[in-house]
Each structure stands twice: as structure tokens, then as C-alpha cells.
């Protein structure tokens, strides 16, 4: 996104501990602005999901949690409060439509519980209970498909029509006259 004021950290990888587990995130851009840390994640999809759907995404929850815990390494402010962290999704198909998702202490605590429960569920599961999907169409786009002997590299997501999400979860309110051309 153009005209961002503050210190910029592009392609930044941060990690933090959650219990006995390490969480890692690679951010498109972290912007340090005054006392705040702002995540920018750009998406190239043609359809823009609803804000509620973005808020519930694992990516949103994980990125904000990790930045809250590890973001002090980017500033001289000391420990970060969740209210100092926000995440912005920027859709290249509609550059003026930035979706901003602020964070809160209440949501932060819910996210910690959510990821602790996922980690425990993984630990509790026996190896034979990690099953492969029967839907081979999903495998075509999975970056881990080689681990299951279902191909070597994932397919192009631009050709994938559905992520199992209802169409009404997406908004497509574009005015093509307002969209600037992107230079390469």
C-alpha cells in the first residue's frame, strides 16, 4: 500500500513460544507507527471476503498473537499490548479497499486458548488418526502434497474456484474506474 508512514519491516519472520510450542509467522509487512504495530497482508484474490470471515481466519488470529508477543523486538517500547496491534488486509484487485482488524485483550486471550487447544489436540492424536482427505481436488493445491505421495508441487491457486466457503462470505463491490493500474 502506498504512502505508509513509519518504520517498515517487509518480509519479516517472527516467532514466539506458546507453552512448549513455537509459533512462527512470516509477515508481508509490519509497520511501526508511533506506539502501534500494524500488519499488512496483501491478497491477490479477485474476491474480497467479508470482515467477519477474515477475523475468524487462523492467519489473522496467529499473526496478531505472535506480533503482540514478539513485536517488542521491533520497537523500544517494551512489552506490547494487544490494543497496539492491528492487521490490515490489502486486496490488490481493489487497492482502495483496505480491511483493518484491530486487536483487543479479550480477543488475544481467546486466541491463546484457541492455539493451546489446537496444539494439545495434535499431541493427543495418534499417528494413525492423521488421515488423508478423500477429496483429491484439495490435494491438487496443497503445498504438502508430496508428504502424502499425491504429487510433487501444488497447483496454481488462481485456478481454484472454491475454498469451501459460501459465495455470500465474499463481497465484490468494484468500480473499475477507481482502480489504478499496477506497474510491474
Describe the role of every protein-language-model region:
Residues 145, 151:
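Cys/His-rich metal-chelating microdomains
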Residues 1-10:
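A non-catalytic, helix-rich entry segment at domain boundaries
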Residues 12-117:
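Mg2+/Mn2+-dependent nuclease catalytic core
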Residues 156-184:
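Acidic, low-complexity intrinsically disordered tails
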Residues 106-143:
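Polybasic (Lys/Arg-rich)
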Residues 126-132, 152-155, 160:
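Basic, low-complexity terminal or inter-domain segments flanking catalytic cores
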Amino acid at each position: 500500500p502506498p504512502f505508509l508512514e513509519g518504520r517498515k519491516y517487509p518480509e519479516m519472520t517472527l516467532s514466539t513460544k506458546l507453552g512448549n510450542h513455537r509459533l512462527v509467522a512470516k509477515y508481508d509487512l509490519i509497520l511501526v507507527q508511533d506506539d502501534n504495530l500494524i500488519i499488512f497482508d496483501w491478497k491477490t484474490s479477485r474476491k474480497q471476503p467479508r470482515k467477519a470471515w477474515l477475523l475468524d481466519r487462523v492467519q489473522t488470529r496467529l499473526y496478531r498473537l505472535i506480533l503482540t508477543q514478539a513485536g517488542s523486538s521491533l520497537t523500544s517500547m517494551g512489552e506490547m499490548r494487544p490494543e497496539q496491534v492491528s492487521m490490515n488486509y490489502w486486496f490488490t484487485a481493489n487497492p482502495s479497499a483496505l480491511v483493518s482488524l484491530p486487536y483487543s485483550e479479550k480477543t488475544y486471550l481467546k486466541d491463546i486458548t484457541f492455539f493451546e487447544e489446537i496444539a494439545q489436540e495434535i499431541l493427543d492424536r495418534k499417528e494413525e488418526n492423521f488421515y488423508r482427505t478423500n477429496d483429491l481436488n484439495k490435494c491438487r493445491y496443497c503445498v504438502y502434497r508430496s508428504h502424502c505421495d499425491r504429487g510433487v508441487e501444488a497447483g496454481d491457486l488462481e485456478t481454484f474456484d472454491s475454498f469451501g466457503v459460501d459465495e455470500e462470505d465474499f463481497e465484490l463491490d468494484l468500480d473499475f474506474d477507481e482502480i489504478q493500474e499496477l506497474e510491474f
